[in-house]
Amino acid sequence: MEPTYSIPSTPLKTPIRITVNNGHNSGQHSLSLSTCKPTPEQNAFNLNMFSEKKKNQYQTPKCPSPPLKSTPASRVNSNLPLIHHISSLSMFSPTTSLSDFMNCENGGSNNIDFSSSFGSSSLNSNNTLSINNNNNNNNNNGGYKIPSSVNKNSNNYNSNSNSNSSNNVISLFDKNFDVVCKLGSGSFSDVFKVKSKFDGNSYAIKQARHQFRGFQERERAVREVKAAVSLPPHTNVLQYYSSWEQNNTLFIQTELCENGSLQDFLDSLSPDQILSEELIWNFLLDVCLGIQHIHSYNMLHLDIKPENLFISSQGNIKIGDFGMAVKLETTNNNNNGNGGCQSNNTSMDSDCNNLSLDEDDIFFDFLEGDSRYLAYEFLLDKKQISKPSDIFSIGVTFFEMVTGNEMPTNGPLWEQLRSDKAIDFLEPGKYSDSLYQVILDMMKSNITERISLDQILLNENIQLVQQKRLNQFQNIDNIENDNNNNNNTDNNNNNNTDNINNDNNDDNNNNINNYNLKLITPYFQYQKERKDEELKEIIEFGEIREIKEKFEHHQFAIPTPHFVRSNAGRSSSSSLFSDEEEDDDDDDDSGRDSPIHFSLNNLNNSSSNIGISESNSNNSFSSILEENNESSSSSPLPSLSFSRRLSTSSLVTTISPKPNFNTSGNKLFSNENNNSNNNNNNNNNNQNNNNNNGFYGFTNNGSCNNLNNLNNLNSSGEFSNSSKKKLGKRGLPLLDVVNGGGNSGSKVCAIKRSFDSHPQESDKMSPRNLLSLFQETN
């Protein structure tokens, strides 16, 4: 009698073994149905069969499901669990600690081949990730050896070992690292400074802020790990060490950059500081070398911005955060790392069509990215996304560096910067035309006209920086050669030569990248001194405040004037408040936290007690707008924080560029320089006239002379003489008290301006200025 087969009604991912009853033998044997053709019954879904086979982890029914709305169709693979994209990266079990990896020696055939670790085999959904980079040249071992606790012959994890996986993964971090401090936070992750318990070195660990909530976040994390592992070490690329997953949260261990990011460095600059041109060229060289290394391995970074550029302890720039990186196919790669173009990007079409990810993937990722440094081809034609897209992001980054203004995220200004009109926002004379021209060439809207990395590296100023670096290393080599010659010739002076060798070895360690340190160290020293001064002022201010509070508790205390402390982000000077309730609520804080907007130049004996704040009009783009006969009220770009706004009037205290740098070439602002000189002369005349009138038109010979006698102030701080005008909130005179209209006793605050010297000024008064002069509050 022929055996009967029980054919399942649902197609399975892996072939099953069907048991056959044999009448001749009491035993049973199994046959494979991998070659069986599917029947119409297999297209139907049987719930009983699904629930029965669901218990077996190696047999997953193929039940297609519609994709999520937020998930591109190209990413949906209903047959694979979510953990598949990250669990197939390593063969290490979650019970293996990081110290086992760090303590490995050369193992010959046991070395891990990470090039083949990104397989397509699906693993259990409870598996975790633990990857180490064997390309790390900093380790003397050269390669890692698989610990004996790992089964090298098994491609799948043991499901029993994952029952307590969360505790094992937590101990992986706690047993090997001590958290020192938190370095910063981003849109997707937090970065911590840690100290290894194994080797005592400091590292940076990036922890995802949220658990993986779908395909997009998981693939983005896997993409960053793949990009970091596939890149060999480079001086200008952040070094990757290892990564692991804990409770659906990714952890990445990298090298630590003590000086923070470039964004932190720019934010720490004071208003009287301006970056030297030589330092900017030095930064540009580091970024271009790092991007050239990334492009040489057919990879696009696509997220170049100051937040992702880190300053090492040696003063050079390192590129990090490969979360947006994409891989180009190896076919038709004829660029040889030339920045994406041959003969001004003539081979652009062959590279643009070799993206390993489709257009939906790139567009979806950049919805979560930063649009301030985004190239225009992402919106016009995503097929043009290629290596010059990274060059555009570099141009916007250095455009922000030389202007000191924050880049817009969208709107007309965003389009204007991508329409070859960035020259309108550059300040003439601040930096050389050569630097401006390179930045403008990197920001070309036409991708075929955009400058390449090879052309940037051939710039004479870049070549000069490279020559200075090369000369420094040659000097170090000459010192070493001289020491060897001294050791061979002076055999009788062994003690002296040993001392010379020790001194020179110390000098060699200190002189490595000393050129970078010489450029950036003055800024760090100035920042440290400024922080010490701020801390000292805070301590002194706290002591004065304590004394002030003690006097306020006594009835005989004399009312002390408010301390003026100007803060960025406060309300503008045109916001006038006169409500009685607001006066009562904000009486203690309004005088300290906001500047007084009128001049008390005639207070001869009380000028030291009252702070006078003055505004500097040279900190923004208003000077450029005045040259173009535009209104200074419509600033083209939103200004940065108070510390980022650069002042052009304090060039004496800045570090000027070296005289041997090229400042010749095509003058970009030849006509504008003449106009700027005329406008500066007019501005100086206007400032002299305004100084005679004081702030808001309070003349030096006006009614402010009545304030000389401080004895007229009563205990509440008001004038005892009723004939003298009272000072309202923000130091404005209360002209009158109007009764009527239902709101009895409502105060009207106004500012008295003097138009005697400039009668024609009232004709040019704009509505915005009128609102700043007169405002009524109920």
UniProtKB/Swiss-Prot annotation:
One of its GO terms (biological process) is negative regulation of G2/MI transition of meiotic cell cycle. Mg(2+) binds at N308, D321. Residues 599-651, 671-693 have a biased composition (Low complexity). It catalyses: L-seryl-[protein] + ATP = O-phospho-L-seryl-[protein] + ADP + H(+); L-threonyl-[protein] + ATP = O-phospho-L-threonyl-[protein] + ADP + H(+). Keywords: ATP-binding, Kinase, Magnesium, Metal-binding, Nucleotide-binding, Serine/threonine-protein kinase, Transferase. Residues 129-162, 478-509, 562-697, 757-778 are annotated as: Disordered. GO terms for molecular function: ATP binding; metal ion binding; protein kinase activity; protein serine kinase activity; protein serine/threonine kinase activity. The active site is at D303. ATP binds at L183, G184, S185, G186, S187, F188, S189, D190, V191, K206. It holds the Pfam family Pkinase. Residues 578-590 have a biased composition (Acidic residues). Residues 177-462 form the Protein kinase domain. One of its GO terms (cellular component) is cytoplasm. Residues 757-766 have a biased composition (Basic and acidic residues). Its EC number is 2.7.11.1. Residues 652-670 have a biased composition (Polar residues). PROSITE patterns: PROTEIN_KINASE_ATP, PROTEIN_KINASE_DOM, PROTEIN_KINASE_ST. Belongs to the protein kinase superfamily. Ser/Thr protein kinase family. WEE1 subfamily. This is Probable protein kinase DDB_G0291133. It comes from Dictyostelium discoideum.
